[in-house]
Amino acid sequence: MSDTLNQLAEVLEARKNATPDSSYVASLYHKGLNKILEKVGEESVETILAAKDAAASGDCSELIHETADLWFHSLVMLAALGQHPQAVLDELDRRFGLSGHAEKAARQPSA
């Protein structure tokens, strides 16, 4: 896993025990999962809009910025639920080289 993701995971974990006024992440944890999920939703919409703008203009700088925000808030969500980013990377590794159709079919419940 990248050093950046590991370092960020460590900081996110440490912020769980911090006072809400000490950092943005600590304040999110203090407000609870619903607030964190609200931020993930907000950043998702902003990322989609930035992608549409990038497609029209060819400038991807805002798309990169919004994607970083989305990833960040997704990592906060995972940490709030006791998950480490490595779990997502492991899932991506598991899927690598597997056709998207085969992977989706493997997730379908049997009838």
UniProtKB/Swiss-Prot annotation:
<protein>
    <recommendedName>
        <fullName>Phosphoribosyl-ATP pyrophosphatase</fullName>
        <ecNumber>3.6.1.31</ecNumber>
    </recommendedName>
</protein>
<keyword id="KW-0963">Cytoplasm</keyword>
<keyword id="KW-0378">Hydrolase</keyword>
<keyword id="KW-0368">Histidine biosynthesis</keyword>
<keyword id="KW-0067">ATP-binding</keyword>
<dbReference type="InterPro" id="IPR021130">
    <property type="entry name" value="PRib-ATP_PPHydrolase-like"/>
</dbReference>
<dbReference type="GO" id="GO:0000105">
    <property type="term" value="P:L-histidine biosynthetic process"/>
</dbReference>
<dbReference type="Pfam" id="PF01503">
    <property type="entry name" value="PRA-PH"/>
</dbReference>
<dbReference type="InterPro" id="IPR008179">
    <property type="entry name" value="HisE"/>
</dbReference>
<keyword id="KW-0547">Nucleotide-binding</keyword>
<dbReference type="GO" id="GO:0004636">
    <property type="term" value="F:phosphoribosyl-ATP diphosphatase activity"/>
</dbReference>
<comment type="pathway">
    <text>Amino-acid biosynthesis; L-histidine biosynthesis; L-histidine from 5-phospho-alpha-D-ribose 1-diphosphate: step 2/9.</text>
</comment>
<dbReference type="GO" id="GO:0005737">
    <property type="term" value="C:cytoplasm"/>
</dbReference>
<keyword id="KW-0028">Amino-acid biosynthesis</keyword>
<comment type="similarity">
    <text>Belongs to the PRA-PH family.</text>
</comment>
<dbReference type="GO" id="GO:0005524">
    <property type="term" value="F:ATP binding"/>
</dbReference>
